[in-house]
A protein has these predicted regions:
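Bacterial N-terminal signal peptides
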Residues: 5-15
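C-terminal and inter-domain tail/linker signature
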Residues: 18-148
């Protein structure tokens, strides 16, 4: 019985790092896709950030503070105040450890919304840095191509 307990302890100790290594086999695009799904689509702000974002997360948006905890502190109340907010991910493009997400953000169902591009740098399966730009979807366009 004691030998079984020792063997089980050794096995668990050896496989725990392997489980983390398996997760880190994810490509940056896969990390961002999982993060964006959990954050934007499922609106699980805290879980998404605690799972996929580095504590020292660098934020380049001049209206937001840097750091994972600061992002959670800002975004949780935002989603509570805007329960009808929705995001439609249009495309995710990766180049090495940089991933761009083009999405349509709306605050209400009848809102034309914003065309948003988030650029994220992934390091060791965690989002380490973020840039974003947003442009209002106009009522009328000079062309018929659409923003998405």
């Amino acid at each position: 019985m004691r030998a079984t307990a020792v063997l089980l302890t050794v096995t668990l100790a050896l496989t725990a790092p392997l489980a983390e290594a398996d997760q880190c086999r994810l490509k940056p695009k896969e990390v961002v896709t999982r993060f964006m799904t959990q954050f934007y689509l499922d609106k699980q702000v805290r879980a998404a950030f605690e799972t996929w974002v580095e504590p020292g997360y660098i934020q380049h948006n001049p209206l937001a503070m840097t750091g994972r905890d600061a992002a959670i502190a800002f975004l949780e109340p935002f989603f509570q105040a805007h329960p009808d907010a929705s995001y439609s991910i249009k495309r995710i493009i990766a180049d090495g450890n940089l991933v761009a997400v083009h999405s349509h953000a709306k605050f209400t169902a009848d809102d034309r919304g914003l065309a948003v591009v988030d650029i994220l740098r992934v390091d060791h399966c965690k989002i380490a840095e973020h840039w974003d730009v947003a442009q209002p979807v106009p009522e009328k366009s000079a062309n018929t191509n659409g923003m998405f």
